[in-house]
Amino acid sequence: MIQFKDFQFYYRKHQQMFEGLNLTLQKGHIYGLLGKNGAGKSTMLKNAVGTLYPKSGSCEVNGVLSSKRKPSMLSEIFFLPEQISAPEVNIDHFIKMNAPFYPKFSRELFDKVMSEFDLKTENKLHQLSHGQQKKVFLAFGIATQTDWLLMDEPTNGLDIPSKSAFRKVVTSFIADDRGIIISTHQIADIEKLIDSIVVIDEGKLLLNKSLQEISEKLSFKLVN
């Protein structure tokens, strides 16, 4: 699981972003992390992977403090950021450099997802469009078969057919022993994917419910 405990974070001393956030996310779900721009969605994801650190409180992944960035934790979480910095290598070389960090990486699965996206591994990463780079990194993330797959605005830069392929490959990833968090403000792109919703605003947790729970609360019975 991913747990935020009494989580506090700010970029500047007098600009508090999170103050005492408590949130638990379980494997086996696809979470939609929703909120307006600047609400703190990206900050949460970056704290989960340990590239940012809480000012107090903690964030744990599978019981390990993410701020420690232990190899055992990093090998079980993959983060697809909104902005990608692609190295000047071809895709095959990228795989050789990065796959060893993920013990469960499957080249067969990577090639399968790349085929879904109609991309070839001979391509140079830095010469691809932003949308194509996202597809490569998503294919790599799926192929890592980590416990957690975190994505920040993953459908930005994708055309309609690519968004359809995105939904297909993400659906293939989910299992009881894996979890997915998708941060977005384009809910239409993921509404058929997610089974749970987390809404934050100005660093506060407004909602953390499954779609089933929400549906049950909104349902009504016809009265004869």
Where are the model-predicted features located?
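A short, flexible loop at the N-terminus of ABC-type nucleotide-binding domains that lies
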Residues: 1-21, 27
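Conserved ABC transporter NBD signature motif
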Residues: 57-68, 72-73
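ABC-family P-loop ATPase nucleotide-binding domains
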Residues: 79-136
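Catalytic Walker B motif of ABC-type/P-loop ATPase nucleotide-binding domains
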Residues: 149-153
